[in-house]
């Protein structure tokens, strides 16, 4: 049974850039959440389509919506600007072309409340034109109740490195912001967040639906794969290696396997893309 205590304010952060076709679906799923004590922060990142007008329409009918308008600066800065003004005890990130089940926030809040968790994570599923219904399996959760267990689960890919799909205690975010990488900004961000967490609940029920499209940020990044991507990843893995090896020496082999996996993935990607040579991948990792 859900805990219906709405005393704690939850801030939902939604960066928006040219998603007019999908935005209403996203916002409808958010404003109709069963958990009502919400601050909904929309950040229009210089959209050139009708996204801003859609945001203004929703703001006019829901007093919980806060609308920020900025010049196009990227998703990282949009999220950071929202974090700077967010008032919630917990923070959730949702992408503007995605949507969530109506009990999404309530389910995650129930987990953080019941287990005194720092983070609750929902299972996610990618959808294209077909809208999939949430599959709810009672008690289908995993609890990671110490930092070593959390880091091990993260390194073994049991825990997501995506900002979306999580409810995060505000205190974990007070000193953390997204770095403005062309890619891997979520990965960079969550290395640091997970290192602070003591209890994480992973709900294996699907309540977050991400839309798979060729013109989204991830689609564009795949098409424009370049050395900028590699430099961003190198920065992340350098921190990854230094920080995690020092703090978790007992997980050394798992840490190095993750670094190797990233290298192999990027070497393979470089072989596919004509604008980056495989030798450039090796050169970057040797420096």
Predicted segments with their positions:
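Short loop->beta transition adjacent to catalytic acidic/histidine clusters or analogous donor-positioning motifs
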Residues: 7-10, 31-42, 50, 62-66
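Acidic helix N-cap motif at the loop->helix transition within catalytic regions
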Residues: 21-24, 38, 49-57, 99, ...
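A conserved acidic beta->alpha catalytic loop
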Residues: 29, 44-53, 73, 95
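Donor-binding/catalytic cores of nucleotide-activated saccharide
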Residues: 75, 96-203, 210-225
